[in-house]
């Protein structure tokens, strides 16, 4: 994990599967597609020391996914910090910030959004290489 740029989780775990170590998570793109019920959790609290946003597909993710509902209940995350992927796709403002820091994408099953975000990031990457 130390030398990874991207970390993906896809488990039905009830407890975080990543270490609660902000230095291991710093500067990574974290994509969590498991923990689809309020009782499940893949991502540790250390993520909230590194980023103040989470990118989601639909607002109900804040209630449905334990990775979000638990930190909201504990006061670590506010619903306003959850940014819709559709808003991300419409805006160029966050791209440089996303590339420079720790980012957290939480997916709860809308693959179409995942594909659109991946397509936009790939296009931006190709643009920068030219």
Where are these regions (language model features)?
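Glycine-rich phosphate/diphosphate-binding loop of Rossmann-like nucleotide-binding domains
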Residues: 1-16
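Residue-level preference for short coil/turn positions at secondary-structure junctions
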Residues: 2-3, 26, 50, 100
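Buried hydrophobic positions in well-ordered alpha/beta secondary-structure cores of metabolic enzymes
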Residues: 7-8, 30, 118
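Rossmann-fold NAD(P)-binding glycine/threonine-rich loop
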Residues: 15, 23-94
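NAD(P)-dependent dehydrogenase/reductase Rossmann-like domain
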Residues: 77-130
């Amino acid at each position: 994990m130390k030398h990874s740029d991207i970390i993906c989780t896809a488990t039905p775990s009830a407890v975080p599967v990543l270490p609660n170590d902000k230095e291991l998570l710093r500067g990574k793109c974290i994509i969590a597609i498991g923990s689809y019920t309020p009782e499940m959790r893949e991502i540790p609290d250390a993520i909230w020391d590194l980023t103040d946003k989470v990118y989601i597909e639909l607002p109900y993710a804040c209630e449905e996914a334990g990775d979000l509902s638990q930190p909201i209940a504990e006061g670590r995350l506010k619903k306003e910090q959850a940014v819709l992927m559709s808003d991300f796709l419409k805006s160029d403002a966050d791209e440089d910030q996303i590339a420079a820091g720790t980012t957290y994408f939480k997916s709860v099953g809308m693959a179409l959004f995942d594909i659109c975000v991946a397509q936009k990031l790939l296009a931006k990457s190709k643009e920068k290489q030219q």
